[in-house]
Amino acid sequence: MSLHLIFSPAGARACLHRWSADDRILLLGDGVYAANQFAQSHVPANAIYMLASDAEARGMTASEQGGIGLIDYKQFVGLTEKHSPVVSWKD
């Protein structure tokens, strides 16, 4: 059960080809702009999370996220503790 950290929209595209049903995805930094890509993909919304502070810093609101869960840093740490490996995707 992997945790995929998405730091850019390009990273999101690469991750979509390697995602498995028991994996989880976290959008961070500019990766939050990829929320729409995931909303239109085969990945269920309950498998995707977004760092709330990064979404807020980019002017995104919870209602715009299409069911993607907004989490804080404490919850981020919890995800890293529950999933292995943790894979980072950027460009």
Where are the model-predicted features located?
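Short, glycine-rich nucleotide/cofactor-binding loops
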Residues: 2-13, 25, 29-31
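Short beta-strand segments
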Residues: 7, 52, 88-90
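Active-site-adjacent betaalpha module
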Residues: 9, 22, 34, 78, ...
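Short, T/G/N/S-enriched strand-turn elements that build extracellular solenoid repeat scaffolds
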Residues: 13-18, 36-40
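Short, well-ordered alpha-helix to beta-strand connector turns
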Residues: 22-23, 45-46, 83-84
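Short internal beta-strands
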Residues: 25-31, 46-54
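N-terminal beta-loop-helix "entrance" segment that forms/cooperates
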Residues: 32-44, 56-63
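C-terminal structural segments of small proteins and small subunits
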Residues: 62-91
